[in-house]
């Protein structure tokens, strides 16, 4: 509708290894648009600016290029854009990195299953089996599968867009623990949230 409207203007962002940088603001402030424009220009048509990873200038014109450069974006809309609810956990977990579980474009079902079980255990996802459809999980466990999907791409930089929206207090705590673990491993995290206490830690 307003294709010429400038959504994000004159933003500088620095994120170090092992650091969480928080972005907060009201709905419509351009937080998600900024994140998606960084992640392979997946939002917007007139994107300008420069992006450096480890001091090296990179051009990320597609989502595939962003993933290859070890960037990950965990969307705020897990049901609409993040997960395929009618598919099992194992398929959703490996979806962003099919090359790692396939040979000559044929998926190794054992590898797919083992990767999903590994992340189920790592993130303490509560489900009887990774053969279960993601749509049957609670919000918190769906969010863990979404995180697992992007962790499996081995990113250096994770953009987490409202990672605790629509989940209970216990699941929120577990998500915070996962973020802390990622930071301890030297990952860089950009966290977007409309909850100021969450951003302030």
Model-predicted segments: where are they?
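Glycine-rich phosphate-binding loops of nucleotide-dependent enzymes
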Residues: 1-201
């Amino acid at each position: 509708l307003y294709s010429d409207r400038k959504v994000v203007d004159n933003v500088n962002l620095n994120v170090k290894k092992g650091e969480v940088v928080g972005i907060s603001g009201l709905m419509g402030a351009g937080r998600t648009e900024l994140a998606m424009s960084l992640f392979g220009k997946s939002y917007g048509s007139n994107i300008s600016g420069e992006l450096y990873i480890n001091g090296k200038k990179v051009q990320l014109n597609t989502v595939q290029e962003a993933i290859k450069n070890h960037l990950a974006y965990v969307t705020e809309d897990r049901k609409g854009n993040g997960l395929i609810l009618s598919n099992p956990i194992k398929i959703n977990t490996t979806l962003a990195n099919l090359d790692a579980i396939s040979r000559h474009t044929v998926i190794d079902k054992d590898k797919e299953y083992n990767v999903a079980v590994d992340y189920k255990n790592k993130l303490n996802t509560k489900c009887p089996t990774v053969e279960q459809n993601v749509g049957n999980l609670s919000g918190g466990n769906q969010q863990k599968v979404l995180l697992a999907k992007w962790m499996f791409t081995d990113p250096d930089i994770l953009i987490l867009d409202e990672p605790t929206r629509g989940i209970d207090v216990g699941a929120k705590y577990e998500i915070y623990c996962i973020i802390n673990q990622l930071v301890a491993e030297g990952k860089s995290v950009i966290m977007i949230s409309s909850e100021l206490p969450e951003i302030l830690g």
